Amino acid sequence: MSKLPRELTRDLERSLPAVASLGSSLSHSQSLSSHLLPPPEKRRAISDVRRTFCLFVTFDLLFISLLWIIELNTNTGIRKNLEQEIIQYNFKTSFFDIFVLAFFRFSGLLLGYAVLRLRHWWVIAVTTLVSSAFLIVKVILSELLSKGAFGYLLPIVSFVLAWLETWFLDFKVLPQEAEEERWYLAAQVAVARGPLLFSGALSEGQFYSPPESFAGSDNESDEEVAGKKSFSAQEREYIRQGKEATAVVDQILAQEENWKFEKNNEYGDTVYTIEVPFHGKTFILKTFLPCPAELVYQEVILQPERMVLWNKTVTACQILQRVEDNTLISYDVSAGAAGGVVSPRDFVNVRRIERRRDRYLSSGIATSHSAKPPTHKYVRGENGPGGFIVLKSASNPRVCTFVWILNTDLKGRLPRYLIHQSLAATMFEFAFHLRQRISELGARA
């Protein structure tokens, strides 16, 4: 297959709508976005990563205390040794000041990051600077080395723990909380600008559409349509899962400037990654296709069960249930990857299909269904929020941009680097087969 012509490459830039704003992406109410990312006053008082940091600070104090007690527990007795180290304190021989230093770190860090919930590094900078300076001076001027192993152990452990706390806060706590806050603000901006769903129906003569799909009136919302049919509790849960997956996909699209480039190929396909709060590393395939968006919508989104005819990365695809016009449950079996090292996996997903002014969207997430319980034949994988997006070109209806967002847990004991390599390779292979399918359909036409 030849590379993309230069003029088609230029069309790529025009075909991708501006996704820097979620205003044209989110199609959900403020209540849904708030459910995904609640406002600060309704979120947990302390994030998981901050709570882990506070536990580590507590461990610092307890560990230093334990080592000090062990040092005090000699033949002369703990009480006599305490009097000698505290009441008859001597800077050169006492370990009491190292315990006080650990308590200083404990009280200062918990006050700043647990009680006051500060989001700045200045508190830990002070505690680490004081700890480091004090320990260096004490090692130089004291006679602790004459006490044997503990003369080495306590200062070294105290120094290492202080710097581990600094690393944990600066590289884990603050960046992750800032990322979650940025996602929340992006969702709030999107909700404020309002949804832009395309409610007009496409004619059946253009391409196949599922029975009663998008058949509601122009002004009907999902809730109004759902109200006309009584859903079971499980069906309502499927609908909710589909909407939540769509909201996360919309937020990922809105963060395109934060996508991290991973690799590309000779056809112009590019794979990016992004860290999504609560879901982890997500892979994104972006490729230009020289065909109308409706054709890709037909082949990839509306008829997933026929994808096995041309997509070699999938060996089986079955629709287990159509919950309502926009929501369905699918069962997929992926082909092996990485030369057979990654064995085939099966997935059960809930999918939500939406048609908008500038794009077609199929988003999904892992779920369970009684028709396909886990079996010994395949390892049951779990997909996080992801899906297919077909972006229309504003200037040329004969071209489009295809985006595949993939967040998956393949389960099994596989090295992380191998999983990442196999996912990127699978995405490139999918794009290759999709391009071949488009060429075949074009030749038939």
From Swiss-Prot:
Expressed in retina. Sterol-binding protein that mediates cholesterol transport from the endoplasmic reticulum to endosomes. The sterol transport mechanism is triggered by phosphorylation of FFAT motif that leads to membrane tethering between the endoplasmic reticulum and late endosomes via interaction with VAPA and VAPB. Acts as a lipid transfer protein that redirects sterol to the endosome at the expense of the cell membrane and favors membrane formation inside endosomes. May also mediate cholesterol transport between other membranes, such as mitochondria membrane or cell membrane. InterPro entries: MENTAL, StAR-like, STARD3, STARD3_MLN64_C, START-like_dom_sf, START_lipid-bd_dom. Induction: Not regulated by increases in total cholesterol content, or by marked alterations in cholesterol flux. This is StAR-related lipid transfer protein 3. SUPFAM superfamilies: Bet v1-like (SSF55961). Residues 46-217 form the MENTAL domain. It comes from Homo sapiens. One of its GO terms (cellular component) is intracellular membrane-bounded organelle. The gene is STARD3.
